[in-house]
């Protein structure tokens, strides 16, 4: 499909035609999409309709319609590793994508737009700015992505999951599921708990080969301590994980997916996991100590930056992914498995970092900005007046602004916009 046109994936499902929606820009990975869905749930519970802008064929086109949310898409994709010809042609494609996004905004008439990151967020955010629609940014990671870096320059409010991402930020946290935030305090769960230590290993939806290999090896080297292991490994790496535990003669419950994560966190005494923003938000909300192994190939090493925040609060231990991981994990587990007081202290420290009301706070701020001054979309005009106004507006302002806007979004080898991550790869 040509990038000049936006594709409606699902028809509007607004509660009331007279109520203008909030538009969410998010896609590419679950780390962008799921926080957006959490905020959408809060907004819709308040009677505010939600619309979504994503990228053709990306994950959001499958997930968002499952929640009965209308989604439009742009033909925008990643250029990392695509060669110099693709990079040289990027400014034209970005300008076309911004125009296509402007078409969607004029059609949907959102009262406010919020970017959670992803391929379509850059064009969508720039179009919102050019059309005078209140724009907000929510950055999940401590090391912000290129798209949100650009949009933060002219967003009305810049919200973050962790402190230390932007000057002038508002660290509201990353949304987590209500049932996780509602778990009892660590002292209530952990004090006096008997039996083997309960170790929860989380590899994410794609699995983590480094954890599949290191955890069984570390436990075997410890001489098979009294520990119950529950290892979530992803469907594609299930056989590999089961074989690793069998070879190490370590008993473990290996699961491709855990449906009830709240119950899993409540069960756990200690977690070994990656350091994605959503996972760490859940670990903190649940109140459980963790051993963090950041994904070594993460863009801008953002998982290490995330992990360092928990380490600075003594809520986690950070281990680098390299050839010595199994040995260093053995050393860390040898200490933590034998020290329930330290595990409790880590869990309590994690809980102090939690922001369980993040989705509510983000929704509050969106609606504050939606009602803070006049937006360029609407202001009581009829549809015909609005169309005439926006066409004139675009002709006079948009074309001149697009060159500068696309230049700031032009992807270079170190950029994150727009970047297509490899699909289905084990991390």
UniProtKB/Swiss-Prot annotation:
Its EC number is 2.4.1.227. GO terms for biological process: carbohydrate metabolic process; cell division; cell wall organization; lipid glycosylation; peptidoglycan biosynthetic process; regulation of cell shape. GO terms for cellular component: plasma membrane. Disulfide bonds: none annotated. Pfam families: Glyco_tran_28_C, Glyco_transf_28. This is UDP-N-acetylglucosamine--N-acetylmuramyl-(pentapeptide) pyrophosphoryl-undecaprenol N-acetylglucosamine transferase. Cell wall formation. Catalyzes the transfer of a GlcNAc subunit on undecaprenyl-pyrophosphoryl-MurNAc-pentapeptide (lipid intermediate I) to form undecaprenyl-pyrophosphoryl-MurNAc-(pentapeptide)GlcNAc (lipid intermediate II). It is found in: Cell inner membrane. Pathway: Cell wall biogenesis; peptidoglycan biosynthesis. The keyword Disulfide bond does not apply. It is an enzyme of class 2 (transferase). It catalyses: di-trans,octa-cis-undecaprenyl diphospho-N-acetyl-alpha-D-muramoyl-L-alanyl-D-glutamyl-meso-2,6-diaminopimeloyl-D-alanyl-D-alanine + UDP-N-acetyl-alpha-D-glucosamine = di-trans,octa-cis-undecaprenyl diphospho-[N-acetyl-alpha-D-glucosaminyl-(1->4)]-N-acetyl-alpha-D-muramoyl-L-alanyl-D-glutamyl-meso-2,6-diaminopimeloyl-D-alanyl-D-alanine + UDP + H(+). Belongs to the glycosyltransferase 28 family. MurG subfamily. UDP-N-acetyl-alpha-D-glucosamine binds at residues 29-31, 141, 177, 205, 258, 303. The keyword Ion transport does not apply. Keywords: Cell cycle, Cell division, Cell inner membrane, Cell membrane, Cell shape, Cell wall biogenesis/degradation, Glycosyltransferase, Membrane, Peptidoglycan synthesis, Transferase. One of its GO terms (molecular function) is UDP-N-acetyl-D-glucosamine:N-acetylmuramoyl-L-alanyl-D-glutamyl-meso-2,6-diaminopimelyl-D-alanyl-D-alanine-diphosphoundecaprenol 4-beta-N-acetylglucosaminlytransferase activity. The lineage of its organism: Bacteria, Pseudomonadati, Pseudomonadota, Gammaproteobacteria, Lysobacterales.
């Amino acid at each position: 499909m040509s990038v000049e046109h936006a594709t409606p994936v699902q028809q509007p499902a607004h509660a009331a035609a007279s109520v203008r929606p909030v538009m969410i820009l998010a896609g590419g990975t679950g780390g962008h999409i799921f926080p957006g869905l959490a905020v959408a749930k809060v907004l819709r519970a308040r009677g505010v309709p939600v619309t979504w802008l994503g990228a053709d064929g990306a994950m959001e086109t499958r997930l968002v319609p499952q929640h009965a949310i209308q989604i439009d898409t742009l033909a925008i994709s990643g250029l990392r590793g695509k060669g110099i010809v693709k990079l040289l042609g990027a400014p034209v494609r970005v300008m076309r994508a911004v125009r296509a996004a402007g078409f969607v905004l004029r059609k949907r008439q959102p009262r406010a737009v919020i970017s959670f990151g992803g391929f379509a967020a850059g064009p969508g955010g720039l179009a919102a700015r050019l059309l005078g629609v209140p724009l907000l940014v929510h950055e999940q990671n401590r090391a912000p992505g290129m798209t949100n870096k650009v949009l933060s320059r002219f967003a009305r409010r810049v919200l973050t999951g962790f402190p230390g991402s932007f000057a002038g930020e508002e660290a509201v946290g990353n949304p987590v599921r209500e049932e996780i935030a509602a778990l009892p305090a660590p002292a209530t769960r952990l004090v006096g708990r008997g039996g083997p230590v309960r170790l929860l290993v989380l590899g994410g939806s794609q699995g983590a080969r480094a954890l599949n290999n290191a955890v069984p090896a570390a436990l075997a080297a410890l001489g098979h301590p009294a520990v119950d292991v529950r290892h979530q490994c992803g469907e594609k790496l299930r056989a590999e994980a089961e074989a690793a535990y069998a070879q190490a003669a370590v008993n473990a419950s290996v699961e491709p997916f855990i449906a009830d994560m709240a119950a899993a966190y409540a069960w756990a005494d200690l977690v070994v996991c990656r350091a994605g923003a959503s996972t760490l938000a859940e670990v903190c909300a649940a109140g459980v100590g963790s051993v963090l192994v950041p994904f070594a190939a993460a863009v801008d090493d953002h998982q290490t930056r995330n992990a360092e925040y928990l380490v600075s609060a003594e809520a986690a231990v950070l281990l680098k992914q390299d050839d010595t991981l199994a040995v260093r994990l053995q050393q860390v587990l040898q200490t933590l498995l034998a020290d329930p007081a330290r595990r409790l202290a880590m869990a309590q420290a994690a809980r102090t970092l939690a922001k369980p009301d993040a989705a509510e706070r983000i929704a509050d701020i969106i609606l504050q900005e939606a009602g803070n001054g006049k937006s360029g979309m609407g202001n009581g005009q009829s549809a015909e007046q609005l169309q005439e106004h926006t066409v004139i507006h675009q002709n006079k302002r948009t074309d001149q602004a697009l060159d500068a806007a696309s230049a700031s979004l032009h992807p270079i080898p170190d950029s994150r916009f727009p970047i297509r991550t490899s699909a289905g790869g084990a991390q």
